[in-house]
């Protein structure tokens, strides 16, 4: 009989092993066997919990996205009520230390690539994109008409993705301060044009 809570413990252990395996070997090298070896468990247990490599990547990305959504919610709740503060909170969550760690960044890159070919991953990416745009648009809408807010949100979302992608591909540790500065300057410019 399995121990109570063992499922959650094993899944967390395997997701962590997946993040670190992708970090070290890339997605191609992140086989069920290599993840199992890193987690010091049998390949059969990985298959039991996730089915196959696609299921493992999907579960790993659900975990990463949940962390991002929780960080976004936490930062938005802590921010002042004005649009600038709320927008900066969303930006800060996207450049949070957890989201810009090597294992998570490499997993994001693998996920984006795979999401173009795998419907379950495409759906996750769609939900993530909609959530980001919804948050940004809602906050910009407090300072400008809805159509302008949509354009501003689209621009900031593209800037977040672009800064994140450049940082991920730079081969250097992610420069969070520089990314925050550029994104926050954009927010200030857009909002200043409406004041």
Curated annotation (Swiss-Prot):
Full protein name: HTH-type transcriptional regulator BetI
InterPro entries: BetI_C (IPR039538), DNA-bd_HTH_TetR-type_CS (IPR023772), Homeodomain-like_sf (IPR009057), HTH-type_TetR-like_transc_reg (IPR050109), HTH_TetR (IPR001647), Tet_transcr_reg_TetR-rel_C_sf (IPR036271), Tscrpt_rep_BetI (IPR017757)
Keyword Transcription (UniProt): yes
Superkingdom, natural source: Bacteria
Annotated GO MF terms: DNA-binding transcription factor activity; transcription cis-regulatory region binding
NCBIfam families: betaine_BetI, PRK00767.1
Domain HTH tetR-type: 8-68
UniProt key word rRNA-binding: no
Function per UniProt: Repressor involved in the biosynthesis of the osmoprotectant glycine betaine. It represses transcription of the choline transporter BetT and the genes of BetAB involved in the synthesis of glycine betaine.
A biological process from GO: glycine betaine biosynthetic process from choline
Gene3D superfamilies hit by this protein: Tetracycline Repressor, domain 2 (1.10.357.10)
Signal peptide (UniProt feature, chain positions): none
Native source organism of the sequence: Paraburkholderia phytofirmans (strain DSM 17436 / LMG 22146 / PsJN) (Burkholderia phytofirmans)
Pfam families xrefs: TetR_C_6, TetR_N
UniProt gene name: betI
Residue ranges: DNA binding: 31-50
Pathways involved: Amine and polyamine biosynthesis; betaine biosynthesis via choline pathway [regulation]
HAMAP family linked to this entry: HTH_type_BetI
Assigned keywords, A-Z: DNA-binding, Repressor, Transcription, Transcription regulation
